[in-house]
Amino acid sequence: MDISIKKHEHILKNEIFFIKTKWPHFDILFKGIKKIAKLSKNNKKVVILERTNLYGGISLFAPFFNLKNFISIDCITEKLKKRGAYNKKFLSSNKLIKIRSEHQYHYKKIKLKKSSADFIIIPNLLHHIDDPSILFKQVKRILKPNGFIFIFEPLVRELHQIPEDYSRFTPFGLTSTLKKFGFKNVSFEYSGGPFTCILYYWDQALQFIPKNLRKK
């Protein structure tokens, strides 16, 4: 891997997703992203559905791919537009590679051709979709026969990006839903357990304590 990409990944893991201290399950996301990046080198088309507006239109994962065969779509909504780029503050490091999303579409109207993508990545997005069935129909339409989708979703998470926080899928619920829409060979990986949940919610509780009192 290129040194600049390694630095980019390091910043994402440690200063945006905090995988060592807060969200360790995001390591699964990075493994999946890098695996698809390797598989897609031979002119395979990759589409990623994101909420890049939060970061000023910057795609966090575009640098991992060959941009000639990569499309980042900002799944924008009117509510998200009003909130603005409130996470852009995390992108101040000059070690980050900043590549903007090429397109902004509502998830119900993704303007890509039928059977045009070999891989579709949906990272940390599904719980912000009010009608997942429409999204899955869009994905099914865009994906080539024998194409591959990679979905990363949290099961345990506080309410966030309110009011656009709609649901949580278990691995089994998501598997069942995907099969209903005709997706085959569905598999999943998950991490964590009860102690991970306890630590996560303890971290959330600490946010309500003034910073000068937390160490005490």
Regions found by a protein language model. Name each.
Residues 118-130:
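A short SAM/SAH-binding and catalytic strip from SAM-dependent methyltransferases
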Residues 1-41:
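Class I SAM-dependent methyltransferase Rossmann-like catalytic core
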Residues 47-109:
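Class I SAM-dependent methyltransferase SAM/SAH-binding core
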Residues 107-120:
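A short acidic, Gly/Pro-enriched loop at the edge of an enzyme's catalytic core
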Residues 44, 114-116, 146-147:
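Surface-exposed loop/turn positions
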Residues 46, 120, 149:
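Receiver (REC) domain switch-region micro-motif
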Residues 130-138, 148-216:
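S-adenosyl-L-methionine-dependent methyltransferase catalytic module, highlighting the catalytic core
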